[in-house]
From Swiss-Prot:
Role: Forms part of the ribosomal stalk, playing a central role in the interaction of the ribosome with GTP-bound translation factors.
Stored InterPro entries: Ribosomal_protein_uL10, Ribosomal_uL10, Ribosomal_uL10-like_insert, Ribosomal_uL10-like_insert_sf, Ribosomal_uL10-like_sf, Ribosomal_uL10_arc
Gene3D superfamilies hit by this protein: 3.30.70.1730, 3.90.105.20, 6.10.140.760
Gene that specifies this protein: rpl10
GO terms classed as biological process: cytoplasmic translation; ribosomal large subunit assembly
Assigned protein family: Belongs to the universal ribosomal protein uL10 family.
Name of protein: Large ribosomal subunit protein uL10
Domain of life: Archaea
Organism, scientific name: Aeropyrum pernix (strain ATCC 700893 / DSM 11879 / JCM 9820 / NBRC 100138 / K1)
PANTHER family reported in the protein's UniProt record: 60S ACIDIC RIBOSOMAL PROTEIN P0 (PTHR45699), LARGE RIBOSOMAL SUBUNIT PROTEIN UL10 (PTHR45699:SF3)
């Protein structure tokens, strides 16, 4: 028997407002492809009101408890694992209905936050600073708190002036009673409270919390690396449907052919210079190996003809252009393979 079927049977008639809510939820579940589920445990009511006020024109929202949510999902034909839903749907939840990208909508919903004061015993979520400047506080017993917290101050015109910005709490620090009172007196609300989406449903597919907030930059890097590897493989096998791969393969083959010609001494247009250079280098190596014996045998190292400076510069520029062209071909291939990501 399903989770919903195991629920106790109600002896009293269901109130009309609950019946109407159930019908409205069922309609929303049936009408919208994407549903976000935000756990409201420990979330102040005014925070939820702020989110609804900001986004209600874009996204229908409802606050409901577990039992009615599960009944509405069942009635709408959302066939998901009952045991999994039992673990995910807890207490009162804010439901956000939409039809767009669930990941973008999660960011949009969670960015709506309300500044709140801290209470004694709270843990600082971020670094808390008291800025330099004039306050509305008058000197008195509160100066002892400034001393405890090592906040530099001056008295100007009968008011306390904070002489230097001071860090009074770091992430994880427990807020003391003195600090909470001082922050309240200064009107500093260091906590930003909002709703947090626990999971989402997109077209009947469950998206758990660990997947709702992907690292976009890391994902982008992975795609670019994969594209480069794909282009490298396409070049290696000369994959014809990718023109950039064919061009890179031709350049690679030309370089390999030139190296092979120089190695074997094959004379052809464009290989003469490489063959001669290799022969001279090999001769020099033999002369060096023979040492004094070479002079006894009358063998001398041939002096290579000095190339004009302009010719050497042109040759270097040509090589640089070829390298740049090869890099451009590899990078432009990413667009061809992945549609301009």
């Amino acid at each position: 028997m399903s989770l919903v079927g195991q629920m106790y049977k109600r002896e009293k008639p269901i109130p009309e407002w609950k019946t109407l809510m159930l019908r409205e939820l069922e309609e929303l579940f049936s009408k919208h492809r994407v549903v976000l589920f935000a756990d409201l445990t420990g979330t102040p009511t005014f925070v939820v009101q702020r989110v609804r006020k900001k986004l209600w024109k874009k996204y229908p929202m409802m606050v409901a408890k577990k039992r009615i949510i599960l009944r509405a999902m069942k009635a709408a034909g959302l066939e998901l694992d009952d045991n999994l839903l039992d673990d995910l749907v807890r207490g009162q939840m804010l439901l956000v209905f939409a039809d767009g990208n669930p990941f973008k909508i999660v960011k949009e919903v969670e960015k709506e936050k309300v500044a709140m004061p801290v209470k004694p015993g709270d843990k600082a979520e971020t670094e808390i600073r008291i800025p330099e400047g004039m306050t509305n506080l008058t000197p008195g017993p509160i100066l002892s708190v400034f001393g405890k917290l090592r906040i530099q101050y001056q008295v100007r015109g009968g008011k306390i002036y904070i002489a230097k910005e001071t860090v009074v709490a770091k992430p994880g620090d427990v807020i003391s009673e003195d600090l909470a009172g001082l922050l309240m007196a200064l009107g500093i609300r260091p906590i930003e409270k909002g709703v947090r989406v626990k999971f989402a449903i997109d077209g009947g597919v469950l998206i758990t919390e660990d997947l709702l907030r992907p690292d976009i930059e890391a994902f982008r890097g992975d795609v670019i690396d994969a594209a480069k590897e794909a282009l490298g493989l396409a070049t290696e096998i000369v994959y014809m449907p990718v023109p950039e791969a064919v061009e890179s393969a031709i350049v690679k083959a030309a370089l390999a052919a030139s190296a092979l010609a120089a190695e074997t001494g094959f004379i052809a247009p464009g290989t003469v210079e490489d063959v001669v250079r290799k022969a001279i280098a090999e001769e020099a190596a033999v002369v060096a190996l023979l040492g004094d014996k070479a002079r006894e045998l009358g063998i001398e190292e041939a002096a290579p003809a000095a190339a004009p400076a302009a010719e050497e510069k042109a040759e270097e520029e040509k090589k640089e252009e070829e390298e740049e062209k090869k890099e451009d071909q590899e990078l432009s291939g990413l667009d061809s393979i992945f549609g301009g990501f």
